[in-house]
C-alpha cells in the first residue's frame, strides 16, 4: 500500500539517496520534522528502544536516535 502523507521537502543541500542497513542518516534527517510518530498508521512495526521511523523521500527509514545508523528501510511507502 502507498500513502499520501502530504507535502515533503528534503533538507537543504541533500539529494535522493537509496538507504541501506548500516548507512548513517545525516543529522538533518533526524530532526523532529521527519520523524513518523504514527508509524502504525503506515503499517510499520514499532521501533525497538532507541530507534525511530523517519521519512526520507518516499521511504520510511528505521534509524538509531543517537547515531542515525539505519536498521531497516520500507521502500516506496509514500507518494
Where are these regions (language model features)?
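Low-complexity segments
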Residues: 1-79
Amino acid at each position: 500500500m502507498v500513502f499520501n502523507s502530504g507535502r515533503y521537502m528534503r533538507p537543504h543541500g541533500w539529494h535522493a539517496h537509496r538507504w541501506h542497513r548500516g548507512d548513517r542518516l545525516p543529522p538533518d534527517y533526524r530532526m523532529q520534522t521527519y520523524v513518523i510518530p504514527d508509524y502504525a498508521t503506515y503499517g510499520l512495526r514499532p521501533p525497538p528502544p532507541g530507534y525511530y521511523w523517519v521519512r526520507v523521500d518516499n521511504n520510511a527509514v528505521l534509524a538509531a536516535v543517537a547515531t542515525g545508523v539505519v536498521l531497516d528501510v520500507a521502500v516506496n511507502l509514500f507518494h
